[in-house]
From Swiss-Prot:
<keyword id="KW-0067">ATP-binding</keyword>
<dbReference type="GO" id="GO:0005737">
    <property type="term" value="C:cytoplasm"/>
</dbReference>
<feature type="compositionally biased region" description="Gly residues">
    <location>
        <begin position="535"/>
        <end position="547"/>
    </location>
</feature>
<dbReference type="InterPro" id="IPR001844">
    <property type="entry name" value="Cpn60/GroEL"/>
</dbReference>
<feature type="binding site">
    <location>
        <begin position="479"/>
        <end position="481"/>
    </location>
    <ligand>
        <name>ATP</name>
    </ligand>
</feature>
<protein>
    <recommendedName>
        <fullName>Chaperonin GroEL</fullName>
        <ecNumber>5.6.1.7</ecNumber>
    </recommendedName>
</protein>
<dbReference type="InterPro" id="IPR018370">
    <property type="entry name" value="Chaperonin_Cpn60_CS"/>
</dbReference>
<feature type="binding site">
    <location>
        <begin position="87"/>
        <end position="91"/>
    </location>
    <ligand>
        <name>ATP</name>
    </ligand>
</feature>
<comment type="similarity">
    <text>Belongs to the chaperonin (HSP60) family.</text>
</comment>
<keyword id="KW-0143">Chaperone</keyword>
<feature type="binding site">
    <location>
        <position position="51"/>
    </location>
    <ligand>
        <name>ATP</name>
    </ligand>
</feature>
<keyword id="KW-0547">Nucleotide-binding</keyword>
<dbReference type="Pfam" id="PF00118">
    <property type="entry name" value="Cpn60_TCP1"/>
</dbReference>
<feature type="binding site">
    <location>
        <begin position="30"/>
        <end position="33"/>
    </location>
    <ligand>
        <name>ATP</name>
    </ligand>
</feature>
<comment type="function">
    <text>Together with its co-chaperonin GroES, plays an essential role in assisting protein folding. The GroEL-GroES system forms a nano-cage that allows encapsulation of the non-native substrate proteins and provides a physical environment optimized to promote and accelerate protein folding.</text>
</comment>
<dbReference type="InterPro" id="IPR027410">
    <property type="entry name" value="TCP-1-like_intermed_sf"/>
</dbReference>
<dbReference type="GO" id="GO:0140662">
    <property type="term" value="F:ATP-dependent protein folding chaperone"/>
</dbReference>
Length: 547
């Protein structure tokens, strides 16, 4: 086992704080509308230029082991806030730095670290309660666009495209972000339920121009096994043909005689039909077929529930306004399922999302919710170069997550103003003893840090602006982009409540741990071993050779 180096108390904390400052100073340069870029070197490919706090934090690794511990703990604040709320990483870093710096100073002055931590925690709980009081729900597209714009570093085009995507697929809908091929951002919306399986035979195609199958007001047969004998289908085919309606068959596989018969009947015009493989595998396939059944008001014909294909009638079939099948995808538009049943199914899947521990399962379950609840929107990010594309895509990701957070918990005035109002509301808070009260004061001072940093990055004097904002009431704040004061909500400068709350709670959590640290243990640096002396003397018989 390698030897360890151990440092204690003030020496330990000062090395840790130095690491915190190095990381925080690099990250906080990106805060606010006039925040600067940070360039990150990559071992291969072009460097990355970013204004995303968590991207900067993730790249930082310090040579000194003890300083690096401080930096890594601060990095945890940024990534936890990013995972939980999708934005606010720089705010969290700035808050944590202020709490740690002031807290460690107080410990050095002889105050009890545990009481300081209790004071900070007490102030944060009170501040979070106050933020929830200030919070307003996001009810309209305009507010959603404003939140997305702020999170995308004041890029209105990104804000508007996210608001449009949310409007089209609903708040539960899936919005995915891809790299585009043009200079402009594009939005593609897939209505209804789409799954990645196409027609079983090109002979089903009825729209030759687009090379797709289009079925209007079709019946939908859902089966969880293979269909190879046409005898199994005769009852259903007869009933559907009598009503002169098209039919979509979704089964594990339609093959052999059954597929050939369907193709022949389709070509002759006896019945308009299309067969498609069921999506997914195993249990996930069963669940997706059940989703389709709920969406279309049908029943999955399965032996598990005592149903066989021969006995199936039109009452077991689902219905939809339109079905579109291409070579690779099937889209069911406007399923005729019962709304209460659909909502119940969505609720059931959401419970599974909360219980699952696998990220992959969670993602797949969220996709299922979206397909039942709204649809899928794809934002294609456009840019001139690959470097710009990566930077822009990261901003769109941030903006989307921040927007979801705003929809979830509402919005508060941005630009650090909500924290200033929370300070005013809880300024009379007292602890159980003097050290706890000092901890509360540390937290209240730290809550000024985001506004100070936004102003400093805009090239103004933080103390002057801060005092003016403190004198104001409610939403009155400073717009760093234009250098004007005004109502932050009317100016469209909004932050999701969840983002600010998470930033404050995560910053306080890590700061509390650092303040109460008394010893640090790291691997001792290896001493350089002396190099062995060079072999003496030349080689005999080599004299006269010119080297």
């Amino acid at each position: 086992m390698a030897a360890k180096e151990i440092i204690f108390s003030e020496k330990a904390r000062s090395r840790m704080v130095h690491g915190v400052n190095l990381l925080a100073n690099a990250v906080k340069a990106t805060l606010g509308p006039k925040g600067r870029h940070v360039v990150l070197d990559k071992s291969f490919g072009s460097p990355i230029i970013t204004k995303d706090g968590v991207s900067v934090a993730k790249e930082i690794e310090l040579a000194d082991k003890f300083e690096n511990m401080g930096a890594q703990m601060l990095k945890e604040v940024a990534s936890k806030t990013n995972d939980h709320a999708g934005d606010g990483t720089t705010t969290a870093t700035v808050l944590a730095q202020a709490l740690i710096r002031e807290g460690c100073k107080a410990v050095a002055a002889g105050m009890n670290p545990m009481d300081l931590k209790r004071g900070i925690d007490k102030a944060v709980i009170a501040a979070v309660t106050e933020l929830k009081k200030i919070s307003k729900p996001t009810s309209d597209d305009k507010a959603i666009a404003q939140v997305a714009t702020i999170s995308a570093n004041s890029d209105e085009s990104i804000g508007n495209i996210i608001a449009e995507a949310m409007k089209k697929v609903g708040k539960e809908g899936v919005i995915t972000i891809e790299e585009g091929t043009t200079l402009e951002n594009e939005l593609d919306v897939v209505e209804g339920m789409q799954f990645d399986r196409g027609y079983s035979s090109p002979y089903f195609i009825n729209n030759q121009q687009s090379q797709i199958v289009e079925l209007d007001n079709p019946y939908i047969l859902l089966h969880d096994k293979k269909i190879s004998s046409v005898r199994d289908l005769l009852t259903v085919l007869d009933a559907v043909a009598k009503e002169s309606k098209p039919l979509l068959i979704v089964a594990e596989e339609v093959e052999g005689e059954a597929l050939a018969t369907l193709v022949v009947n389709n070509i002759r015009g006896i019945i308009k039909v299309c067969a498609v493989k069921a999506p997914g595998f195993g249990d996930r396939r069963k669940a997706m077929l059940e989703d389709m059944a709920v969406l279309t008001g049908g029943t999955v014909i399965s032996e598990e529930v005592g149903l066989s294909l021969e006995k199936a009638t039109t009452s077991h079939l689902g219905k939809a306004k339109k079905v579109r099948v291409s070579k690779e995808n099937t889209t069911i538009i406007d399923g005729m399922g019962d709304n209460d049943a659909i909502n119940g199914r969505v609720k059931q899947i959401k419970t599974q999302i909360e219980e699952t521990t696998s990220d992959y399962d969670r993602e797949k379950l969220q996709e299922r919710v979206a397909k039942l609840a709204g649809g899928v929107a794809v934002i294609k990010v456009g840019a001139a170069t690959e470097v710009e594309m990566k930077e822009k895509k990261a901003r769109v990701d941030d903006a989307l997550l921040a927007t979801r957070a705003a929809v979830e918990e509402g919005v508060i005035p941005g630009g650090g103003v909500a924290l200033i109002r929370a300070i005013t509301a809880i300024s009379n808070l007292k602890g159980a003893n003097e050290d706890q009260t000092h901890g509360i004061q540390i937290a209240l001072r730290a809550m000024e840090a985001p506004l100070r940093e936004i102003v400093a990055n805009a090239g103004e004097e933080p103390s002057v602006i801060l005092n003016k904002v403190k004198e104001g009431k409610d939403n009155f704040g400073y717009n760093a982009a234009t250098g004007e004061f005004g109502d932050m909500v009317n100016l469209g400068i909004l932050d999701p409540t969840k983002v600010t709350r998470s930033a404050l709670q995560n910053a306080a959590s890590i700061a509390g741990l650092m303040i109460t640290t008394e010893a640090m243990v790291a691997e001792a640096p290896k001493k350089d071993e002396p190099t062995p002396p060079a072999a003496g003397g030349g080689m005999g018989g080599m004299g006269g050779m010119d080297f």
